[in-house]
């Protein structure tokens, strides 16, 4: 069977970054297709008719939607190398729990940090820091979230790092001073080839967010 | 169904009228796992619940041999991986992926959208009903040619989507707003009949009369006009 793998993505998306990393962890060759989200391709609309969102993983013509579901799919289909989820059911449950936490809590919180101003932004910043501290606490003294090996929760979270300078710029704070251990973890992850190749330059992300912010916070 | 070893301790902190709690009971019962149910008063959370789920402080929490697992979809996967009799997720990776997708869809799209009807009237309410119906139509199409979302037997998505069959549809009965009319959603109604024919579902969903009373009381508290 010819393994045809296409990833419909958008370069600054922290969700797309997950799928890029997972594919590279498994050594899977894939065709990256950049989507213009203001002018979505017919393929995107066909492959994700419900959400119409990226990333979409297309494996031998069949779509897999939702980044965190894509990561699990990649882990199961290409199971021979670099396992992403632990094998123990309890540890797997913990990994799924924290990835779910990131999706439900961190994403919404970060949006308030860069897309609002004034009191709303201050409240958003406070929430965001609290969530990062919860994650830092979960990481503890482990090198990675599941222990010794880079895995599911690391993949779920690391892409947000590329947006950190934008948060710091627009909300005027230092993330490293709030969660130093988490930043040390970031640096360790960045040494991984799969991560380094999959994450965009944070400066470019900041430029992107600057433009985006103008739509939400007219100056 | 054979009972598990006596050394195994399975506790479920839940709430009798919660769809997220009941789905865990369905999975455990389907697997023949004995468990102790600990009813929680969600207006006055026990110190045990706060200890076991310090992040979200929500039910359900499954405690298996002293270890807590939270978030109903996470718990369901844990149950399926731990007790392998009567698998509820498909074996094929792609089919399994689709089951995860539809389950997330039920909880994060259908449920979240339908809940917005609370406190709304007139055109605003109509808009929420329309949005909910649009989402339900995807489920309707997914059901064509199947007895259950899991195919020929009860599966993961059926268990998750009892939320639609017995919470959403019972709530519309109380509120008097037709969200799932049979003429628009014949497959969903057929599916609900099939669910009601399943012994585990019948045993595990809240008794209808009590549940309707509970929903009515809750809706009145939220100032929703009853039909």
Curated annotation (Swiss-Prot), chain A:
Keywords: Cytoplasm, Detoxification, Oxidoreductase, Peroxidase, Phosphoprotein, Stress response, Transferase
Limits of the GST C-terminal domain: 88-208
Main EC class the enzyme belongs to: transferase
Binding-site residues, glutathione: 13-14, 39-40, 53-54, 66-67
Keyword Glycoprotein (UniProt): no
Entry EC number(s): 2.5.1.18
InterPro entries in alphabetical order: Glutathione-S-Trfase_C-like, Glutathione-S-Trfase_C_sf, Glutathione_S-Trfase_N, GST_C_Tau, Omega/Tau-like, Thioredoxin-like_sf
Catalytic reaction(s) noted: RX + glutathione = an S-substituted glutathione + a halide anion + H(+)
Induction: By dehydration stress, salicylic acid, ethylene, methyl jasmonate, auxin, H(2)O(2), copper, benoxacor, isothiocyanates and the pathogen Hyaloperonospora parasitica.
Cell compartment(s), UniProt: Cytoplasm, Cytosol
GO cellular component: chloroplast; chloroplast stroma; cytoplasm; cytosol; mitochondrion; plant-type vacuole; plasma membrane
Residues covered by the GST N-terminal domain: 3-82
Gene Ontology MF terms in the entry: glutathione binding; glutathione transferase activity; peroxidase activity
Chief location category: cytoplasm
Origin superkingdom: Eukaryota
Residues carrying Phosphoserine: 198
GO BP terms: cellular response to water deprivation; glutathione metabolic process; response to oxidative stress; toxin catabolic process
PANTHER family named in the record: GLUTATHIONE S-TRANSFERASE U19, GLUTATHIONE S-TRANSFERASE, GST, SUPERFAMILY, GST DOMAIN CONTAINING
UniProt family annotation: Belongs to the GST superfamily. Tau family.
Biological role stated in the UniProt entry: Catalyzes the glutathionylation of 12-oxophytodienoate (OPDA). In vitro, possesses glutathione S-transferase activity toward 1-chloro-2,4-dinitrobenzene (CDNB) and benzyl isothiocyanate (BITC), and glutathione peroxidase activity toward cumene hydroperoxide.
UniProt-recorded name of the protein: Glutathione S-transferase U19
Organism: Arabidopsis thaliana (Mouse-ear cress)
Lineage: Eukaryota, Viridiplantae, Streptophyta, Embryophyta, Tracheophyta
Gene: GSTU19
From Swiss-Prot, chain B:
Its EC number(s): 2.5.1.18
GO biological process, one term: response to salicylic acid
Binding site for glutathione: 18-19, 44-45, 58-59, 71-72
InterPro entries named among the record's database cross-references: Glutathione-S-Trfase_C-like, Glutathione-S-Trfase_C_sf, Glutathione_S-Trfase_N, GST_C, GST_C_Tau, Omega/Tau-like, Thioredoxin-like_sf
UniProt domain GST C-terminal: residue ranges: 92-215
Enzyme class (EC, first level): transferase
Principal subcellular localization: cytoplasm
Molecular functions (GO terms): glutathione transferase activity
Any single Gene Ontology cellular-component annotation: cytosol
Keywords assigned by UniProt, alphabetized: Cytoplasm, Detoxification, Transferase
PROSITE patterns hit by this protein: GST_CTER, GST_NTER
Domain GST N-terminal: 8-87
Places the protein is found: Cytoplasm, Cytosol
Catalysed reaction equations from the record: RX + glutathione = an S-substituted glutathione + a halide anion + H(+)
Record Pfam families: GST_C, GST_N
Family of this protein: Belongs to the GST superfamily. Tau family.
Function: May be involved in the conjugation of reduced glutathione to a wide number of exogenous and endogenous hydrophobic electrophiles and have a detoxification role against certain herbicides.
Protein name: Glutathione S-transferase U7
């Amino acid at each position: 069977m010819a393994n045809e793998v296409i990833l419909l993505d958008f370069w600054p998306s922290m969700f797309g970054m997950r799928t890029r990393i997972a594919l590279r962890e498994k050594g899977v060759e894939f065709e990256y297709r950049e989507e213009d989200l203001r002018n979505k391709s017919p393929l995107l609309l066909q492959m994700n008719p419900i959400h119409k969102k990226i990333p979409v993983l297309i494996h031998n013509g069949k779509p897999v939607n939702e980044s965190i579901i894509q990561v699990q799919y990649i882990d199961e289909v290409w199971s021979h190398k670099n396992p992403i989820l632990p094998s123990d059911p309890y540890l797997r449950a913990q990994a799924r729990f924290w990835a779910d936490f990131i999706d439900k809590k961190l994403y919404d919180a970060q949006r308030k940090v860069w897309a609002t101003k004034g009191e709303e932004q201050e409240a958003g910043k406070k929430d965001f820091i609290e969530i990062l501290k919860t994650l830092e606490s979960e990481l503890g003294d482990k090198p990675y979230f599941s222990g010794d090996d880079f895995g599911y929760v690391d993949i779920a979270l690391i892409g947000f790092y590329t947006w950190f300078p934008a948060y710091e710029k627009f909300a005027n704070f230092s993330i490293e001073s709030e969660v130093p251990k988490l930043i040390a973890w970031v640096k360790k992850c960045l040494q991984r080839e799969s991560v380094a190749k999959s994450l965009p330059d944070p400066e470019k992300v900041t430029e992107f967010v600057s433009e985006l912010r103008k739509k939400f916070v007219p100056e | 169904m054979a009972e598990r070893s006596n050394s195994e301790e399975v506790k479920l902190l839940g709430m009798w009228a919660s769809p997220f709690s009941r789905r865990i009971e369905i999975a455990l019962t389907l697997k023949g796992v004995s468990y102790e149910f600990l009813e929680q008063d969600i207006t006055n959370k026990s110190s045990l619940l706060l200890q076991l789920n310090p992040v979200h402080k929500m039910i359900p929490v499954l405690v298996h041999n002293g270890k807590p697992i939270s978030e109903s979809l996470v718990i369901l996967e844990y149950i399926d991986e731990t007790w392998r009799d009567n698998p509820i997720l498909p074996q094929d990776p792609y089919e399994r992926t689709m089951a995860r997708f539809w389950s997330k869809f039920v909880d994060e799209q259908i449920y979240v959208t339908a809940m917005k009807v609370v406190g709304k009237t007139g055109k605003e309410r109509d808009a929420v009903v329309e949005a909910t119906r649009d989402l339900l139509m995807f489920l309707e199409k997914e059901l064509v040619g199947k007895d259950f979302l899991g195919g020929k037997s009860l599966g993961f998505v059926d268990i998750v989507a009892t939320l639609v069959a017995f919470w959403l549809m019972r709530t519309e009965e109380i509120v008097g707003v037709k969200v799932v009319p049979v003429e628009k959603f014949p497959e969903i109604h057929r599916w609900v009949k099939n669910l009601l024919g399943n012994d585990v579902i019948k045993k595990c969903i809240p008794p209808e009369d009590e549940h309707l009373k509970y929903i009515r009381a809750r809706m009145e508290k939220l100032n929703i006009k009853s039909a």
